[in-house]
Amino acid sequence: IAPRPQKSIPVWLGVTSKVAMRRAARIGDGFTFASAGKSTVELANKLREMISEEGRDSSTFPIEFNMPYGLGPEKWGDLTDQARNASISHLCVNTMSVTSAWSGTPPSGLESVDDHIAGLERFITAVT
């Protein structure tokens, strides 16, 4: 790579097996969860414990929730509140319907670029 980065490039990890979470706690620069919800909050708390056990400051370790847009506004607010209460530092809103097939969540129903932009505006309005 030229020019060489002035700082190391952050490496975020994400898989919720105990071994993978321990590895993230030991060497990761951040962690991303593929979903959002109560079990994710519990896993985030467990990850913070592991980070502390590794002698690292868990309060500065970024953690991301991934929220499927297809869940709809009736769930967005609650899940966003759970993320805030759990001190989740990042929130990804997944508007791609293709991922709903493997995640088991409702598709977003968004097709065009304008649909996606309007969808993100609806999300922001619903959670702020």
Q: How should these model regions be labeled?
A:
Residues I1-T128:
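Active-site-adjacent structural elements that line small-molecule/cofactor binding pockets in enzymes
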